[in-house]
Structures are given as C-alpha cells and as structure tokens.
Amino acid sequence: MIHDLLLACRSHNPEQLGIKAFNETTVIDQFIHPCEREIFMDIIKIIKVYQEVEQFTHSSGRKSDTHGELPDSLHGYYLLNLAKGIEMALEEYYAEIGRLEKYCLGNERNSLSYVYNALYAKFPLLVFMRNLITEIHVLNLRGCVLLHNLHQQCEHGDIQLEKAIKIIMKPVKNAFFSSLAHWLLFGVIDDVHSEFFIKFTPTDAVDGSSFSKSATCSLLSAEKNPEDYIWQYEVNMSQLPGFFSIVLAEKVLFVGQTVLVFKMGRNVKVKNKTDPLAAKLAELDSDDIYQLWSGRESEFFKMVVDLSNEDTINVFRLEKVIIDIKNYVSARLSEIAVNEVDLERQMGLIKDFFLLGRGEFYLEFCSQMVGTMETYREERFKNVTRSFELAATVTGITDDLDKFSLICQRSTSEPDDTSDFNFLQGLSLKYEYEWPLNLLFSPTTIERYNNIFRFLLIIRTYQYEIQRVWAKQTWRAKSAKDVPPNNKIITLRNYLMFFLNNMQYYIQVDVLESQFGILMNVIKSRSDFEVIQRAHTVFLANVLSHCFLLNESETQLNVTGSQNRNPIYGTLLKLFGICEKFAHMTQTKDPSDDLEDEVDQLNESFGVQIASLIQLLVDVKSASCLGPLSQLLLRLDFNCWFSASHNTSA
C-alpha cells in the first residue's frame, strides 16, 4: 500500500488518483491503523499540491502546435521557460520519491510516518511553487515582468526556497539575456508574443499592437519603409522589468537602433582608393556591421553571457555592461558622423534652409512665390516648387539644395482655399540626410523642423508683402502728383512691419542663434553621439517652446491654422490674418470705396491683438525666467506705445 502511495506521488492527473478513493472504503482499516489515517490524509494533501504544480508545467511546457505554427499567445516563451525551470526544481522532489521507493522495497517493515516525514520536508517547496504559479495567473504575468517577479523573490530567508527560485529563474533569465544580446549586437528581435521590453510596432498597425510580429515581419517593413524603420522600435513600457530603469532601456534601444542603421546600409565612402582594406569594406554587403563592432562583438557577447551565467541578476553589473556597450557604440557613431559625414556642415545646411538662414535665397523665393499665390489654387501647387528651384538658381546655391526639396501638401479641410496662410501651411521641406544620421533626424524631428520652417516662412512672406505695400503706395504718390499718399495705410503698414520685424529678429537672433550656438559647441567638442542626440533634442524643444509652437503641456505641436491651447500662438495667428488682409486690401487693382474704413477696422483690430499679445507676454515673463521672451517684450513695447494706448501695464 505504501508503494502505491509513492506511485501516486508522481501522478500529475488528479482524476487518476486511485489512492484517494481507497480512503473512502472500509478496506482501509485492514491496512492503516485509525491513528495513521490523519497522516495518510496529510500525504494526500502533499500529493494534491504537487499535482497542481505538475499540471502547470504540463500545460505550459508542451508544444501547443505540432505543425510549426505559432503557439497560443497565452503560452509565451517566458512561461515555457518557467515551466522548464519548475521541472528542474522538482528534480529534488523526484529524487526523494525515488529514494523512498528504494527504501521501502529494501525493507519488509515500513512506517507511514517515515514516508510522511520525508515528503513533508519537500512540502514547503511545493507550496512555494504553487503560490508562485497562482500569483502569475492572478496578476497575468508574462515576459520581462514575469522575470522581475522571480527576481524579487530571489532574496529568500529559507535556503531551500532560495536555491529553488534560482533554479526556476535560470531558464527565464537565459531567455531574457538571449533577447538582450540579439538586440544589442545584431538588432534582431524575434518576439512573437511581445514579451521583451523593446517592441516593434509597424506604422500600419491598426491598434498599435506588436503581437504576432516576428523578425520576418520587421524585415518586410524595413524594405517597405526604410526611412521610418528604426523608429518603429520603441520601449515597451508594459514589459519593462522593475530592475531596468527607463534611462537604461533608452540606452538599449539606442544601441539596437544604431546596429539597425549599420545593417540597413553603411554606404562606406572610400577616401583613400589605394587602400585595399578600405576598398574591400566598401564592397561588402550592407548587412555587414563590421565597421561598427570592429571585431569586438564576441567580447561584448561574452559580457552578456557572463551576466546570464550568474545565479541571480546582478543589476549593477548589468547596468555597467549596457553602459559600456552604449559608450563604445556612441563613440564609434560620433566618429563616423563628425569625421566622415561632416555633421557640422549638415547642421549648417539645416539652419540655412529649415531655419531660413539663407536670407537672400528666401527673399528671392518670396519674390517668385508671391506671384504664384495670386493664381488659382491648382496652379499654386504646380508653380511653387518651380519658384523654389528658380530662387536657388538665381542665388547660385543649387549644389547646396541637392538634399532639400519643397513639397506641397493639399488639404481638403482648409476653411478658405484662397487663403495665403493656408497655402503656406501646405509647404514643407524634405531632407535627404546622409547615413548614419538616421538616428538624428527621425520623421518626428523632420516634422518639427517643418513646423518651425512654416512659421518662419509665414513671417518672411508677410514681411515681403507688407514691404510691397509701401513700394506701391510710394509709386502711386510719385506717379499721380495730385494724389497724396494715404497716411492711414502708411501708418498701419508701419505698425505691421514693426511687429513682423521684431518677431523675425526675436526668433532668428534671440532664439535660433543662441540655441544653435549651444548645439554646435556640443558637436564641435566631438562628444559621443548620444550626447549630440540629446543636445539636438533639447535644441528643438527650446526653439519650439520659444516660438510658441508647443501647447501648455509641451507634448503636442500646435496645428497651425486650427484651434490650439497656446494663447500666445493663437494671438499671433490673428495678427498674421490682419497682415494678410491688409496686404490684399491695399494691393488690389480696384480698391473698394470704403477702403479707409476697412483700414480703420484693421488698425483697431491690430491694436487690440498687439495689446493682448503684450499682456500675454507679460504674464508668461512673470511666471518664468525666459531671457529671449524679455527681449521680445522690450522691443515690441520699448516706449509703452501699445500698452499705454490700450491700458496694458507692461
């Protein structure tokens, strides 16, 4: 009977536990003394706990599909390895059962109490495993979060349980470090269940989910959209383990993205064509990342393997290994970007065209474009790109403009298709950056540059048109000597020009020059690429903030031409609208009879809006310490002309 009881200790199916039914019959009295029945029931309880654990390992560890298809999403790769770890931890329990079987077979007289005492020594281990499985099911733990839960339980007061949890965690830990090594060194993630803390989210995903996205799917996305490919990888916050900080996860993401950039296309430029090694490297396939690692990938791989071989996760050593790999990758990338690609010159071109640094070019472009905007809408989109090319030819900068092209985006939701403002909002620049600057100019970054570009182009275009008002009024006064110049038009024109000139000076000098100088100092110091990347992000954020192109939460860009949350920007839009109406009103061939009344209305509207702008700037300045904003306020209202006229205290 005891041997049957020991056989039941290995059974994983509670339905086939015949020894339990034996207790419900009267035959049990012939084999077990009534005093031992309680001991017998306690052994049954131990067996039931074991069966709960064994059922989990059997259901989670089996192959759910024998035809090579993807398994059920409920059985992830980490759960599979958890089942393997539990099976490994149960080996000690199985060994004890085997020892008891040999002992009982070798002795004629066996005690049920002896069997119970031997099994009870393993009971805490079984209960611990059952509680662990229950917690995983209740909290729905999976992936890296599951590993974090196991890591938290490593520091255990019971030596037996501490040893067991390390055995259980080992396969799960190996799976984690395997994914980490493949991402860091090869830029590969084969994560069909989204269990890793780096995930791939294709741009055409409906719900933003990365489930069922394998490495094959990501490669197809790379071929379809190579420019946006690396930015489709992001930190999966739902799977970020607690022992991994967000900053450290961003470093891991950066390293993997860098590897992807090298795999997608190195485009090695051979400066010394007589060097056979350099020529050979230039002929290598784009999937070769030798230029990045320089043969040190085995060294870094061994560092990750050593982390995996430790009994527990050494958080401090893990952080040090990742930082060492990141520093090496960042230094190599900085060396290539600064020396081979000439990052300083690339940023100079960005400033010249996105930030309107080439004043003579954009003056000529405005001259060409203003005539284009007077045509019908369909002709505008056809002619504006031609105006851009003509301006480059006239100013002799065609070579510098090779990497830039003007794009016209047609919007069907515009409230007024004839509005110059809405037409300007459809313009954007496309920049063909050189490899490996993919990591610096993401699609989001280019879109932010285009927001600044459109904002500056609007100011520059209205400056040109308001200047034409003065030229036309002066020409009329000289050509018709008996008709004096309209003082109301000239006065309002001076007000508008004063506003536009100060806005342009504030943005170009107080904001762009100072912030761009800080960025260039970082680049010239030849810092590692992550520092350059961070400085570039700060540069863009500061420029957008000082140009009032961010809303109050500074998380979303204002959609120009629509309702927004930034009151300063909304006031600027109204002032731009006044500039546009004034330019059209005063330059028509047949002005209306009530032109002066319309000018008076615009003058009054301008006074209200400029006073509102000054008051908003005063409020913002008092709530912050923005130096450039103080300069703008001082220039706009240096003699309190506008504030005194509209009872606004500056």
Curated annotation (Swiss-Prot):
Keyword Phosphoprotein: yes
Compartment list: Cytoplasm, Cytoskeleton, Microtubule organizing center, Centrosome
Phosphoserine modified-residue sites: 214, 218
Function as written in the Swiss-Prot or TrEMBL entry: Gamma-tubulin complex is necessary for microtubule nucleation at the centrosome.
Keyword terms: Cytoplasm, Cytoskeleton, Microtubule, Phosphoprotein
Organism encoding this protein: Drosophila melanogaster (Fruit fly)
Disulfide bonds, paired cysteine numbers: none
GO molecular function (one): gamma-tubulin binding
Chief subcellular location: cytoplasm
Family (UniProt): Belongs to the TUBGCP family.
Pfam families: GCP_C_terminal, GCP_N_terminal
GO biological process terms, semicolon-separated: bicoid mRNA localization; cytoplasmic microtubule organization; male meiosis cytokinesis; meiotic cell cycle; microtubule nucleation; mitotic cell cycle; mitotic spindle-templated microtubule nucleation; spindle assembly
Residues found modified as Phosphothreonine: 216
Protein's name according to its UniProt entry: Gamma-tubulin complex component 4 homolog
One Gene Ontology term, aspect cellular component: spindle pole
